[in-house]
């Protein structure tokens, strides 16, 4: 319920078009940092309004150069590692994991899945050219990890990006064009 309240708050701040809100620039971001702060500056969980402001600024920089995120993803040529490309676009922002750490990069993998896959139910499939579904990494959470260990899809005990890649490789043997299709089965 709290995430829905935050989504409604963003809708009130950004209006009908978050894209246009971002494109209009710094002055439109004022509500994100000129708001009265009661206690902490927390927007959601560990993410602050300042973090949200920095994300909007980064998106504006991207949209000043490219028409859309997909174009930014495709700009460097064929995308071998979409998680790395996405991480590079948003490097140094709070909430964006570094790839040499212990993170499984679940949120990045989930975002990419939503943008690339088209299932008509959960995944939006907005991006058609920058990334192919076979390049996606399964969004690894504790449940998928535990089931994958039991099924022998991975032998990795920690839930890291390496583990997510190992599970994805195992699923690619069954679903070579779309390994994340196995996410729903797990």
Segments from the language model and where they lie:
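HhH-family (HhH-GPD) DNA N-glycosylase catalytic core used in base-excision repair
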Residues: 1-186
């Amino acid at each position: 319920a709290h995430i829905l309240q935050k989504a409604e708050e963003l809708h009130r701040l950004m209006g009908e078009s978050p894209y246009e809100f971002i494109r209009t620039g710094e002055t439109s971001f004022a509500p994100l940092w000129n708001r009265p702060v009661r206690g902490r500056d927390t927007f959601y969980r560990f993410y602050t309004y300042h973090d949200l402001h920095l994300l909007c600024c980064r998106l504006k920089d991207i949209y000043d150069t490219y028409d859309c995120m997909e174009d930014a993803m495709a700009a460097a040529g064929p995308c071998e590692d979409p998680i790395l490309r996405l991480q590079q676009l948003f490097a140094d922002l709070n909430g964006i994991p570094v790839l040499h750490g212990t993170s499984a990069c679940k949120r990045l993998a989930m975002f990419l899945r939503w943008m690339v896959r088209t299932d008509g139910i959960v995944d939006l499939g907005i991006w058609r050219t920058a990334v192919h579904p076979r390049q996606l990494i399964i969004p690894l959470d504790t449940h998928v990890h535990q089931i994958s260990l039991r099924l022998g899809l991975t032998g990795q005990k920690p839930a890291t990006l390496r583990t997510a890649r190992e599970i994805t490789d195992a699923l690619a043997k069954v679903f070579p064009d779309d390994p994340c299709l196995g996410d729903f089965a797990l």
